[in-house]
Each structure stands twice: as C-alpha cells, then as structure tokens.
C-alpha cells in the first residue's frame, strides 16, 4: 500500500510550492518527491510516474511484472493500492483514468475529513519539514527539491526506524531485512583475563 498526499512549503523568495510524496506503508520507503507550484491532477500523475520509475530502477523491472493474473479471466491484478485523501487531484477523471491504465495499481480515497486514515503520509511530511526544511532558509524550488531529496536518501538508506524494528526502509523494501526482526550490530564483549 502506498500513501500519497501533497504538502505546501513557502520559500524565502516568496514562492509557495507543493510537494507530492508517496511512501510505502509496509517498508516506510519514501519514493522521490515531486515539487511543483501546483497540486493538480497532472502533478498527482507525475508523482505516481516518479514512484513507478523508482520502483523499476530498484527492482530491475516494472511493477506490472510482479502482478498476479486471474486464472479464470486472464486479468492482471493490482499489487499496490494507492491511498489518498479526497482532494481534487485524486477525484479527477484524468487521475482515475491514469490508474485504470496501470493494472498494477488500485486507488482508494480515505473518508472525508479523516486525515488520520492517511496519517503515516501526514507524519512523513511533518518529519521532512522539521528535520530538513525548517532548519534553515530555503530560497527557491530548486533548493527545496535538493533538500527534500537529501532527506529522502538519509531517511531510506542511513537512519534506522523504530516502526520497522530498527531497520532501514530501503533494506526492508528490497527484502534484505525483516521489518519484525531488529538488525542491530551485535558486538561480542569477551573477558580480557
């Protein structure tokens, strides 16, 4: 399951930018952020395309190759459900048509006025802002995109996460670590005498 939403950030030069973020709920892996002056149906599609391209790069094949096929109908079944709120970009015909063209994806929207149903994504934006964006001045969209990407790399590859047993999201996402089994460095301390 992917959790997807938009967040806003105002730069020091006065521009307000929208950051689209998609995170894998199970592994906590953050896909690349899409930064734009708008948060419309085109931006939503661009963000999903970025995530699909990142998936293909990580796993060496497109996501659709992992889809099971219904043996009775021959229909390709989705392997990822994208969870969004009820914002305009996600209710648009164009976004729904895009999802329909990708049999590997399904889309559900949370209940109206229920941000907690997409709370992991909301919390992810809070962490991005407080750990990376609010600590110094960001002049423009280019700097915003650079800081967001720096955060994403650190978040996915460097720091361990309590929610996935102190493993790193990229390792869990690639199946190199179990999100239920801690991956601590065990240092054996032997007696010196």
Language-model regions: role of each:
Residues 33-34:
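Short hydrophobic alpha-helix segments
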Residues 5, 28, 85, 118, ...:
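Short, conserved catalytic/metal-binding motifs centered on acidic residues
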Residues 81-86, 100-120, 135-140:
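RNase H-like polynucleotidyl transferase catalytic core
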Residues 78, 96, 100-103, 127-193:
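C-terminal domain-tail junction helix/linker
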Residues 19, 40, 44, 83, ...:
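Hydrophobic (often cysteine-bearing) scaffold residues that line and stabilize catalytic clefts
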Residues 1-23, 29, 42-50, 54-70, ...:
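Mobile-element integrase/transposase regions
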Residues 48, 60-91, 111-115, 165-169:
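Acidic/histidine-rich, metal-coordinating catalytic segments
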């Amino acid at each position: 399951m992917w959790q997807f939403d938009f967040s806003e950030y105002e730069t020091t030069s006065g521009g307000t930018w929208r950051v689209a973020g998609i995170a894998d709920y199970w592994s906590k892996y953050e896909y690349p952020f899409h930064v734009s002056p708008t948060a419309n149906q085109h931006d939503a599609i661009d963000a999903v395309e970025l995530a699909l391209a990142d998936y293909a790069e990580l796993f060496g094949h497109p996501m659709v190759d992992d889809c099971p096929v219904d043996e009775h109908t021959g229909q390709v079944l989705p392997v990822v459900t994208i969870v969004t709120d009820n914002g305009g970009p996600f209710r648009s015909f164009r976004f729904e048509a895009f999802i329909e063209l990708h049999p590997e994806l399904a889309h559900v929207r949370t209940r109206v006025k229920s941000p907690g149903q997409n709370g992991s994504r909301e919390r992810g934006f809070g962490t991005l802002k407080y750990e990376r964006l609010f600590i110094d001045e960001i002049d423009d969209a280019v700097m915003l995109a650079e800081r967001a990407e720096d955060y994403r790399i650190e978040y996915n590859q460097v720091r361990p996460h309590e929610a996935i047993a102190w493993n790193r999201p990229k390792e869990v996402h690639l199946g190199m670590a179990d999100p239920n089994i801690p991956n601590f460095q065990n240092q054996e301390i032997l007696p010196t005498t």
